[in-house]
Amino acid sequence: MLIKQLADIRSGVRYNPTMYPFARKLPDAQALADVAGYIGTLCFPLDSGKYEGADAAGHIAGGKLLYENNCARCHQPNGAGKKEALYPVLAGQHFRYLLRQMTEIRDGKRVDVPAEMFEALSMFSNADLVLVSTYMASLNTPESLLCRTPVTKTKKQE
């Protein structure tokens, strides 16, 4: 899945102005595979990037209903995804990342996804995207993806 994402960024199919300059420097398929292999060894910091607003509990409850009705069939009820079908892990992803990706898919800036994603997200309002992103970020990250050492925030991240 990471190889496809990097290839899509490099070709301009996937909108990511931050990564594009780096991805386009990868000279061939082996370089893409090498970088994807390395990225695949990285882990998710525990409890990193959760929605922290005072209304988080309400957002999680509302987002859970949206997730169960629109996302769980492909991404699994626990958000673990289906690697063999190229459905990514959503559980424990960073709230802002999830919100940005779903907004870009809904708004047509990201076109490297199955038609079902466009259909599912086309009916989501901005508020719905905040709710479902809050819920997905609150899910437990699969154990195999967690960092075992604490990650400290930089001043920019705080």
Named regions from a protein language model:
Residues 1-26, 60-64, 76, 80-107, ...:
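Gly/Gly-Pro-rich "capping" loops immediately C-terminal to redox-active cysteine motifs
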Residues 46, 77-89, 112-116, 141-154:
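Short flexible/disordered coil segments
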Residues 35, 39, 63, 68-77, ...:
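The canonical Cys-X-X-Cys-His
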Residues 1, 7-19, 26-34, 42-49, ...:
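Short sequence/structural segments immediately N-terminal
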Residues 11, 40-44, 68, 76, ...:
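Residues at helix-coil transition
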Residues 40-66, 82-86, 152-158:
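Electrostatic cytochrome c docking/interface patches
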Residues 24-48, 101, 120-157:
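C-terminal capping alpha-helices of c-type cytochrome domains
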